């Protein structure tokens, strides 16, 4: 069992989780998530590593918000507490939601970067959801 109990998942948290995964014997892993999310890169690294296990379980006793939701959805099984919560995966750049930055008229380069980022994240999420949701519902 690998706990991810952190208000913010950053690269150092991801490094610790990946190191713990490397130490596991076998092809099973269980993550316990209690987080508000964090750095998209860190969450994607953990998600990609989670996909490498034949059997993976994400346990969410209370909350796995944004990037925590992304990680939880990449497990082959999700177990949630009675009052647990997931949320939208809502990436941010410079403290602003990507979807809002993509609409900026004042800074075209930031808006273009945000649109590119948003398209990439939507593709990643679509691939993640394909494992759990029939194609027709995506």
Regions found by a protein language model. Give the residues of each.
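Terminal-region recognition feature
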Residues: 1-138
């Amino acid at each position: 069992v690998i706990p991810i109990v952190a208000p913010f998942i950053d690269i150092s948290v991801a490094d610790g989780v990946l190191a713990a995964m490397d130490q596991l014997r076998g092809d099973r892993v269980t993550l316990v998530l209690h987080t508000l999310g964090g750095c998209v890169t860190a969450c994607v690294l953990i998600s990609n590593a989670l996909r490498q296990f034949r059997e993976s379980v994400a346990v969410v006793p209370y909350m796995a918000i944004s990037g925590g939701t992304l990680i939880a959805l990449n497990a082959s099984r999700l177990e949630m507490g009675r009052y647990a919560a997931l949320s939208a995966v809502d990436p941010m750049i410079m403290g602003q939601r990507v979807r809002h930055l993509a609409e900026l008229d004042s800074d075209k380069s930031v808006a273009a970067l945000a649109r590119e980022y948003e398209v990439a994240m939507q593709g990643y999420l679509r691939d993640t959801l394909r494992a759990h949701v029939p194609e027709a519902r995506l």
